[in-house]
UniProtKB/Swiss-Prot annotation:
Its EC number is 2.5.1.61. This is Porphobilinogen deaminase. It comes from Moorella thermoacetica (strain ATCC 39073 / JCM 9320). It catalyses: 4 porphobilinogen + H2O = hydroxymethylbilane + 4 NH4(+). Binds 1 dipyrromethane group covalently.
Length: 313
């Protein structure tokens, strides 16, 4: 019997994702036993400050990566949207699981859609990406910072008198909140975060035993899509807390990547598209970044970082 230690954040959604990885591994390798090890990350500890004000380098990953490098765990399970595009030396992505619905969902107890929300409705989200795209589509809305796990955010919606909140469809579905009344926001209005809806497995570089184990649960179409999105984000030198979005779709070996860059207030927005192949998904990411940079994305992001720097001191 082989035993490996699987690292995860402590949140309900993170545990769900880790359990999915454990079940998939134990099904693929009948002689394998996995033990769950949970850790609190910096992002889990600071809940009263908007993410953009904290900084985003490894906000939800660093503690797990340190445990991985120290040998306290054998692999770490992450939401791919939380992972910086550059990993610590000695660590690699060993596998990416099948993607859940990557869309954002507008949740409203009254059943409002983005189009029918009242003028100046209060909508909760802390994501700069979501705020910028919502402000572009509905500049009248009052966008309110909202942090916490899915159940916490749903509770805060009622407590804080919010008309609606925006959540990731993947989290709602994985935690069986699919019955929550919500409208998937169309991609032409709100593109998701890079890697949204995908589960990543991080391992030590050179750990052949664990690499072989996790390779069995890798989903090549999702892995190619996420690699394209991350290459795009890396080429733009963006982090999780900037108004950058992307979504790659894969059919056979063909890959199509959509991307968006916006100012914090949503007044400036650039969108474009690039095509490529699953044989070299990063090339599509770099091409899309090149196209947007040629149209002024660099200047927009420079201004975003200057404004964010004011918050972070």
């Amino acid at each position: 019997m082989i035993e490996i230690k699987v690292g995860s954040r402590e949140s309900e959604l993170a545990r769900w994702q880790a359990r999915w990885v454990i079940q998939a591994l134990e099904k693929a390798w009948p002689g394998l036993s996995c033990r769950l090890v949970t850790l609190k990350t910096k992002g889990d500890k600071i809940l009263d400050v908007a993410l953009a004000r904290i900084g985003d380098k490894g906000l939800f990953t660093k503690e797990l990566e340190l445990a991985l490098l120290d040998g306290a765990i054998d692999l770490a399970v992450h939401s791919m949207k939380d992972m910086p595009t550059t990993l610590p030396e000695g660590l690699v992505i060993g596998a990416i699981g099948p993607r859940e619905d990557p869309a954002d969902v507008l949740v409203s107890p009254e059943g409002y859609t983005l189009a029918t929300l009242p003028i100046k409705a209060r909508v909760g989200t802390s994501s700069l990406r979501r705020k910028a795209q919502l402000a572009y589509a509905r500049p009248d809305l009052e966008l309110v910072d909202l942090r916490g796990n899915v159940p916490t955010r749903l509770a805060k919606m009622e407590r804080d008198g919010l008309t609606a909140i925006v959540l990731a469809a993947a989290g709602l579905k994985r935690l069986n909140h699919g019955q929550v009344l919500g409208e998937p926001i169309p991609y032409h209005i709100c593109l998701p975060a890079v890697g949204q809806g995908a589960i990543g497995v991080e391992i030590r570089a050179g750990d052949r035993r664990v690499a072989e184990l996790v390779a069995a649960i890798n989903h090549p179409p999702t892995a190619a899509a996420v690699r394209a999105e991350r290459a795009y984000l890396r080429a733009l030198e963006g982090g999780c807390q900037v108004p950058i979005a992307a979504l790659a779709t894969v059919e056979d070996t063909a890959l199509v990547l959509q991307g968006m860059v916006a100012s914090l207030d949503g007044r400036e927005m650039l969108r474009d598209i690039a095509s490529g192949s699953t044989r070299d998904p990063e090339a599509a990411g770099r091409e899309l970044a090149r196209k947007l940079l040629a149209r002024g994305a660099g200047e927009i992001l420079q201004e975003v970082k200057a404004q964010s720097g004011k918050y972070q001191g």
